[in-house]
């Protein structure tokens, strides 16, 4: 038994060294903290990522019960994106979501401010704008705070123009700036960052008309001239320079505008381009000038000879033009030197098409095979493979043609050339396009689940994932003005095209996706199929389905026409005067409707699609259901098409369409029929063996 003294000695020994326990306690605390943090990370890793494809019920469950506050906020924002017509619900969902330093906090504060403004709470909205400005001065979401608070504090508007020059709020500020000032700073800003903003053209012209002494500087006039040229007003652009020489960028922009004009303007453009190339042979604009001078099928030999040798030598466009002038001589060396260049791709097709139309099958095949398929973008590779198969069939090598076409069908999404391959193989062709006997599905097809944007920026990707597409687009614009995202790469075109379509700009968005498809080389099957589906939206489906039912015509044909005519943009007006979703001439529309229509009626997608369907029905009846003649007539008119009727249409319709003398109608017919086949097949097409994911 220990004595009390020994016990006291033992206890005192322990108490006498209190520091001995601190490392143990501290280590235990640190281990506990590490375990908690690791556990939180593990739980977060196990949490389901929220996307628009998650059901409303599941979102509400996550919003209420998730252990992760960040996920609860994401659920709230996704629910907000789905509750655009319910400001009171949005207010409840957004309450308290502006916590922390995450970029999503800035977005939540912005949405709260906008919602309070919508509900009439101006004072509360201003408080939120001020909080947003203080906490997140550089966030894309804060642009609206600079704009609204800038009404009382003009200095904030000036800061906005510098910080986020491409943001819609900055562009609106620029317009309002010129309305209250005669210094034209808004016009100068718009010439650099927002030439397509409504009202910009008038502001740019006004700035250019200001006296040179008190108006824009010489450098600013160069920018204004570029803006006007990009808007198509070459005359105002030249006038804006006040007789000073155009810098390379301005000279190129003005020349591009002039090339779209009459014969005299085209000659003026050629002179400007040649001057640009001769005076600045090393400038990047001179490469494009050489491309433009080389572009026609029948280039001007004198202009090409006048180009600086150092510039001409490194230009595949100039080399291709010289091949054309020499009737194809030395084509092989050009195609082998620049197999990755669009100028070579175009030269290859021009020479192959010429040989095909002459029935020179061996020559056509040789030219078509001069660039490996793997070097070509998907649409051009499909064209190449179809015609190689065609030349084999024409030479009696039917088994070889069959193998080529079957391979084409396995590796390319549905389009014009896969349709023709299937027709040649006897596997499938177009169904009847009109008539009471049609079995028409009026249901909009489900084309797969939501897909990610993969922009390369985490915030843009997150906002897209949460259904906040406008915020994703504005954040992307902010990035474009800060980084090298202005580089016009195919991948950036895909991202920007999808964002544009998501915010309602189908005209630009579809164009960017198509241009991307003509530059992407070597993409995997899933990317190829995804890009193809992205280019075939079902916008205005209710109006198109109704027009289809009313006229017993396939809705896929209406979609195919609308995509090519207006890119699903009802406000578009052609230079010839055609308007609306289906691009009808007012005279044609009046005849179809038994009376004149005002502008608003003709721009209405429901009215326009109904009249377009009626016109197509009459054309199908006139041509006994022939799709080639119907589509060509929609573009060029039945009178012109009547002159092109030959036996070749039945025997080799692919060659018949290539003989159409109007280049616009030739391309139009192939594109619309390709669109039609895509829409007909898109419900069932599964090109890739693995499931499409992005």
Q: Which residues are covered by each model-predicted region?
A:
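N-terminal Lys/Arg-rich, disordered targeting/topogenic segments
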Residues: 1-18
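Alpha-helical solenoid repeat scaffolds
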Residues: 3, 17, 23-547, 556-563, ...
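Catalytic and substrate-binding regions of cell-wall glycan-acting enzymes that process beta-1,4-linked
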Residues: 630-685
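Substrate-binding/active-site groove segments that recognize
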Residues: 575-597, 607-618, 639, 672
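Glycine-rich, acidic and aromatic/proline-enriched surface loops and short helix-turn segments
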Residues: 362, 370, 564-567, 581-594, ...
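Short, functionally critical alpha-helical segments immediately adjacent to catalytic or ligand/cofactor-binding
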Residues: 545, 552-570, 612-613, 630-635, ...
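Short, contiguous acidic/charged loop-to-helix segments that flank catalytic cores in large enzymes
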Residues: 529-535, 572-576, 595-607, 621, ...
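Secretory-pathway/luminal and periplasmic proteins that interact with or process carbohydrate-rich
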Residues: 414-416, 430, 521-523, 567-573, ...
């Amino acid at each position: 038994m220990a004595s009390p003294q020994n016990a006291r000695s033992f206890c005192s020994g322990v108490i006498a060294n209190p520091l001995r326990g601190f490392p143990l306690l501290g280590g235990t605390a640190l281990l506990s903290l590490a375990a908690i943090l690791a556990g939180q990370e593990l739980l977060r890793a196990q949490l389901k990522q929220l996307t628009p494809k998650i059901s409303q019920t599941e979102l509400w469950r996550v919003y209420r019960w998730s252990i992760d506050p960040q996920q609860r906020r994401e659920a709230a924002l996704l629910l907000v994106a789905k509750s655009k017509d319910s400001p009171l619900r949005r207010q409840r969902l957004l309450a308290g979501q502006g916590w922390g330093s995450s970029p999503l906090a800035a977005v939540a504060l912005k949405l709260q401010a906008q919602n309070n403004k919508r509900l009439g709470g101006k004072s509360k909205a201003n408080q939120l704008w001020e909080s947003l400005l203080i906490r997140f001065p550089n966030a894309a979401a804060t642009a609206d705070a600079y704009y609204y608070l800038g009404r009382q504090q003009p200095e904030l508007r000036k800061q906005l123009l510098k910080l986020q020059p491409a943001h819609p709020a900055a562009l609106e500020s620029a317009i309002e700036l010129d309305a209250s000032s005669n210094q034209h700073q808004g016009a100068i800003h718009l010439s650099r960052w927002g030439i397509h903003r409504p009202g910009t053209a008038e502001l740019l012209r006004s700035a250019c008309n200001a006296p040179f002494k008190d108006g824009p500087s010489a450098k600013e006039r160069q920018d204004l001239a570029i803006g006007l040229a990009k808007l198509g007003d070459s005359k105002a652009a030249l006038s804006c320079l006040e007789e000073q020489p155009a810098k390379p960028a301005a000279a190129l922009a003005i020349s591009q505008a002039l090339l779209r004009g009459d014969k005299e303007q085209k000659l003026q453009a050629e002179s400007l381009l040649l001057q640009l190339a001769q005076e600045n042979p090393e400038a990047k604009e001179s490469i494009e000038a050489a491309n433009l001078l080389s572009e026609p099928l029948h280039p001007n030999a004198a202009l090409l000879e006048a180009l600086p040798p150092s510039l001409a030598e490194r230009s595949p466009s100039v080399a291709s033009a010289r091949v054309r002038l020499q009737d194809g001589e030395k084509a092989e060396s050009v195609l082998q030197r620049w197999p990755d260049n669009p100028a070579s791709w175009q030269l290859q097709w021009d020479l192959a098409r010429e040989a095909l139309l002459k029935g020179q099958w061996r020559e056509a095949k040789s030219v078509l095979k001069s660039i490996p398929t793997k070097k070509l973008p998907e649409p051009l590779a499909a064209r190449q493979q179809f015609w190689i198969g065609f030349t084999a069939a024409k030479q009696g090598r039917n088994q070889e043609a069959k193998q080529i076409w079957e391979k084409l069908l396995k590796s390319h999404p549905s389009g014009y050339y896969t349709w023709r391959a299937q027709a040649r193989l006897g596997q499938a062709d177009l169904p009847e396009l009109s008539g009471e006997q049609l079995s028409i599905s009026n249901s909009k097809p489900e084309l797969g689940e939501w897909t990610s944007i993969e922009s390369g920026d985490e915030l843009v990707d997150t906002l897209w994932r949460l259904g906040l597409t406008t915020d994703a687009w504005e954040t992307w614009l902010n990035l474009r003005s800060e980084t090298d995202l202005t580089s016009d790469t195919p991948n950036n075109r895909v991202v920007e095209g999808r964002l544009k379509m998501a915010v309602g700009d189908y005209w630009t968005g579809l164009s960017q996706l198509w241009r991307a498809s003509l530059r992407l080389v070597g993409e995997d099957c899933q990317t190829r199929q995804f890009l193809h589906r992205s280019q075939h939206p079902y916008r205005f489906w209710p109006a198109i389905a109704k027009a289809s039912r009313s006229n017993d015509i396939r809705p896929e044909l209406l979609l195919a026409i609308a995509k090519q005519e207006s890119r699903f943009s009802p406000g578009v007006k052609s230079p010839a005067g055609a308007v609306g979703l289906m691009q009808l001439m007012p005279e044609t529309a009046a005849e179809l409707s038994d009376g004149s229509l005002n502008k608003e009626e003709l721009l209405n997608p429901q009215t326009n699609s109904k009249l377009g369907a009626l016109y197509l029905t009459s054309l199908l009846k006139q041509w006994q259901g022939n799709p080639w003649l119907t589509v060509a007539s929609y573009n060029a008119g039945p009178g012109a098409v009547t002159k092109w009727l030959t036996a070749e249409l039945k025997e080799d319709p692919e060659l018949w369409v290539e003989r159409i003398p109007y280049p616009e109608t030739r391309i139009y017919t192939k594109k619309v029929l390709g669109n039609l086949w895509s829409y007909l097949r898109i419900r069932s097409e599964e090109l890739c063996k693995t499931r499409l994911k992005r």
